[in-house]
C-alpha cells in the first residue's frame, strides 16, 4: 500500500499553507524515515514542538483533507509532513501514548527536562465521532495544551494503523539515534 506524503520546509512561519508543497508518493514504511532523516539532517536540539493537526477541505474530496505533522524548531523553522485522511475514534489511546513516548524520547535526546519541553504538552484531550465526506466513520481529537492552545486532528478510520506504524517508525529512529556508540 502506498501513502501520499507531502513535505515542506518553512523557515519563516509555522502557519499552514497549501503553497510550496511537493507531492511525494512513498510506501508507508518510508514516510517517517523521511521525517527522521530531516530531523537528523537538521539540529534536533532545536526542535521545540511537534504538533499533529489537520486542514479540512483544501479540496473537494476526502482525499484532499490533509493531516499535518509539524516539527517546529525554536528558531521558527518547520518541517511539515502531510498525508491523506483516515483515522478513527480509536486514535485517542494510541495517539496519546505515542505523544508521551515522543516527548520523553525527544527530551532525552535534546537534554531538556520533560517538564520544560513541550511537544505534546497536553492538559487534556477529547474525541468526537463524526462522518467523513466519503461516508466512513471519522474521529476528531482535540488536545488542550498547558499553554491553552488547541490542537485538532480529524481523519477517517481506514488508516489508523498507518499513523500508528509511522509514529512507531519515528520513535524507533529516535531511539536508535540516541543510543551511545
From Swiss-Prot:
Domain of life according to the entry: Bacteria
Keyword line: Plasmid
Name assigned to this protein: Uncharacterized protein y4wG
Organism: Sinorhizobium fredii (strain NBRC 101917 / NGR234)
Amino acid at each position: 500500500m502506498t501513502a501520499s506524503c507531502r513535505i515542506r520546509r518553512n523557515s519563516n512561519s509555522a502557519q499552514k499553507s497549501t503553497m510550496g508543497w511537493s507531492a511525494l508518493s512513498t510506501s508507508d514504511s518510508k514516510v517517517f524515515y523521511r521525517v527522521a532523516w530531516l530531523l537528523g539532517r537538521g539540529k534536533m536540539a532545536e526542535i521545540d514542538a511537534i504538533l499533529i493537526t489537520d486542514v479540512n477541505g483544501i479540496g473537494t474530496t476526502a482525499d484532499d483533507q490533509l493531516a499535518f505533522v509539524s516539527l517546529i524548531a525554536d528558531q521558527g523553522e518547520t518541517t511539515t509532513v502531510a498525508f491523506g485522511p483516515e483515522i478513527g475514534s480509536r486514535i485517542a489511546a494510541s495517539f496519546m501514548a505515542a505523544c508521551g513516548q515522543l516527548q520523553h524520547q525527544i527530551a532525552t535526546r535534546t537534554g531538556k527536562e520533560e517538564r520544560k519541553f513541550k511537544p505534546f504538552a497536553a492538559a487534556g484531550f477529547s474525541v468526537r465521532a463524526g462522518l467523513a465526506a466519503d461516508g466512513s466513520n471519522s474521529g476528531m481529537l482535540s488536545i488542550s495544551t498547558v499553554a491553552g492552545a488547541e490542537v485538532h486532528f480529524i481523519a477517517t478510520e481506514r488508516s489508523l494503523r498507518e499513523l500508528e506504524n509511522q509514529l512507531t517508525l519515528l520513535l524507533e529512529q529516535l531511539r536508535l539515534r540516541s543510543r551511545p556508540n
